[in-house]
């Protein structure tokens, strides 16, 4: 009876430790979501004036954006991505994409010109993936006239800084394998790696999947390590 009792106590203790660790992870995500402006401590990144561009950068919750701005973001995403979605097993689903982009958890990093016209954006969220607190980048979309000027890389670098400052362990995103330019951009220019949760790594469907999940650890994440065995998916809502 003594050995059984000890095993039960150890099992209970492990559960308590795992729950405490997950509570700490969710507390960080909740704290990040309560920020008014994640860029407030990084004013130097609130403008982009390189390669002929002079843009203002802002970071807001979707609830703080005008309906016109959200509609512009959707239409730009549709124009840039619909064909790529239709070439995948997902297909293009307008209602689902609109709901995703309007979800109250959504944050937007926006680049506007001198007339306040939006020209590029990233939709991201603070969330939990497999026990880790992460910044998940859902979209990074640019109008054609501001592409190939370093702006996309700049926006992703801002996301990495925001992730580190809010103690997220990594920046994650999903990219289609057949979107060769984007795949090369993230893997080579930004040094993202194929995440351990990606189908090709986890063995769930591998080569049959049209996408990879990529990630890059923050400085905070490199120091703090990984919470193995955590639940995959959001836990804080």
From Swiss-Prot:
Keyword Lipoprotein: yes
Known function: N-alpha-acetyltransferase that specifically mediates the acetylation of the N-terminal residues of histones H4 and H2A. In contrast to other N-alpha-acetyltransferase, has a very specific selectivity for histones H4 and H2A N-terminus and specifically recognizes the 'Ser-Gly-Arg-Gly sequence'.
Broad EC category: transferase
Binding, acetyl-CoA: 140-142, 148-153, 179
Catalytic activity: N-terminal L-seryl-[histone H4] + acetyl-CoA = N-terminal N(alpha)-acetyl-L-seryl-[histone H4] + CoA + H(+); N-terminal L-seryl-[histone H2A] + acetyl-CoA = N-terminal N(alpha)-acetyl-L-seryl-[histone H2A] + CoA + H(+)
GO MF assignments: histone H2A acetyltransferase activity; histone H4 acetyltransferase activity; protein N-terminal-serine acetyltransferase activity
Family statement: Belongs to the acetyltransferase family. NAA40 subfamily.
Protein name per the record: N-alpha-acetyltransferase 40
Annotated Gene3D superfamilies: 3.40.630.30
Lipid addition sites, N-myristoyl glycine: 2
Subcellular location: Cytoplasm; Nucleus
UniProt entry keywords in alphabetical sequence: Acyltransferase, Cytoplasm, Lipoprotein, Myristate, Nucleus, Transferase
Site-annotated residues for Essential for catalytic activity: 139
EC numbers, comma separated: 2.3.1.257
Domain of life: Eukaryota
Positions of the N-acetyltransferase domain: 63-216
Translocase recorded as keyword: no
Binding site for substrate: 85, 127-129, 138, 174, 211
Entries under Pfam families matching the protein: Acetyltransf_1 (PF00583)
GO cellular component: cytoplasm; nucleus
